[in-house]
C-alpha cells in the first residue's frame, strides 16, 4: 500500500486529466496504457526486484550489483531531492486552501472573504512568507511520518489514507457529474477588433468530452476549449479579465503523435514514481513471499484509476461552473477549482475541504516515499557500519535540506517575485525550465533524470547483469514468472527504445 501511495500524487490530480484532454483524449489514454505495459511494468518489476534482492535503498542496491553502478543510485537520490523542493511547496499550498475553506465554512476571518479564486491566489502569491510557512508545515508532516519508518509511519498512513482517498474521490465525482452548467457572461472579441457581450455555455458533459473524446482535442496551446455564442453565431475568441483567449472547436488542432507519446511517457514516469529509486527502496522492504509481478500490476492499475477518477472529479466541475477559466497547472487547483466551490453556495466549503484534504493526502503519500529514498540510504549505511538506528537524525537532516529548496520555490511565487532562473540569468524569452523555480526543478527531475535513470536501469538489466536476475528474484515468492519471455524482450529492446524517445521528447519540451 505504501508503494501505491508513492505512485498516487499531484500528477494524478491535475497532471493526468489536463494532459489527457489536451493531447488526444481517449487516444492519449490508450497510448499511456501501452507505455505503462511496455515501459512502466518492466521498469517497476525491475526496480522492485533490485530492491528486494539486495535489501538496500537506491545507492546500496546498485552498489551491491556492481560498484560501477553506484552513481545511478545517487541519480535517484538527487531526483528525489529536486522533486521534493517543489512538491512540498505545492503541498503547502493545498494545506493553505484546506484552511481557507474551513474558514469559509465557519465564517472565520481566514476564509476567502468573498474574493474570487484568482484574487485569492494572487494575494497568496503576493505573500511569500505565507507560502513559505505552509510549505514548511508540509515538510514537517512528511518528516514526522518518515521518522516512524516503513511500518510505524508510512504503511499505516497509506493503509488508512488510500481507501479514504478513493471514497472522497467517488463522492466528488458524483457531485461534479451532476452539476448544472453555468452560462458565463464574457466580452467577445470580434474579427474587426470590437467587443460585444456574449456567453460561454457551461456543461459537465463538456468536461467528459474534453477528457474522453477520441482523436485530438481542440485546445492544444489554449486555455479555453469551450464555445462562445453571440446572436446564435460562434465567435473565435473571448475576453477573460481583460485578456483575449482563443475559442476553438473540438478536434481542430492536432499535436504530433511523437509529442503525445512523449507527454504520456513523461506523465507515466512521474505518476508511477519510476526512475528515482522509490520502488527500489520499497522493494527492499518486500517479503520474499510477495509476488512482484502482481504488486507491479496492482500499483499501475490503482494509480491509473486514481488519475481517471481525479479527472472525472475535476474536469466536469470545471467545465460546468467555470467554463471560461484557466485549466492548466497549479491554476487548475487553486483558481478554477476554488471558483467552482464558490459557485456551490453553502455546500462549497464542505466540498472544498474534502477536495483539498484528498489532494494533501495524495501529495503527502508521494512526498514520504521521496524522503524515504534519501533517508533509507543513510540508514542502511549507518546499520552496515554498526552505528545503530539513525533514522530520526538522518530524517531531520534530509528534511532540513528539503526546506532550503522548498523556501526557494515558495519565495519565487511561481515566477512572480523576480528571483526566477530567467531573472537571475537575464533570459528575455525563457523556455519552460527557466520560467520559475518550480519548473526548473521539474525539468531536471521529470524531464531528464527520471527517464534517464529508468533507461540506464533497463540497459543494465537487459545487457549487463541479465534479465535472468529478475526472474530468479521474482520466483522467490513461489510463483512462476509467467511474463518472463515478454519481460526479456521488452527490457532488452522495446523499453530502452521507448525510453530514448521519451527522454528526447522531454528534453525538447522543457529546454528547447
Q: Where do the language-model regions lie?
A:
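Inter-helical loop and helix-membrane interface segments of multi-pass membrane transporters/permeases
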Residues: 19-23, 56-71, 75, 89-151, ...
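Loop-to-transmembrane helix boundary motifs in multi-pass membrane proteins
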Residues: 129-133, 302-308, 352, 361-364, ...
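Membrane-water interface regions at transmembrane-helix termini and the short interhelical loops
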Residues: 19-23, 49, 53, 64-65, ...
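Membrane-embedded translocation segments of transport machinery
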Residues: 159-368, 382-394
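Juxtamembrane transmembrane-helix boundary signature
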Residues: 1-4, 31-66, 88, 317, ...
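Select transmembrane alpha-helical segments in multipass membrane proteins
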Residues: 1-3, 28-31, 68-81, 135-136, ...
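C-terminal membrane-solvent junction of multi-pass transporters and transport-like membrane proteins
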Residues: 75, 375, 381-401, 440-499
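Transmembrane helix-boundary motif of multi-pass solute transporters/channels
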Residues: 1-33, 277-278, 294-297, 301-302
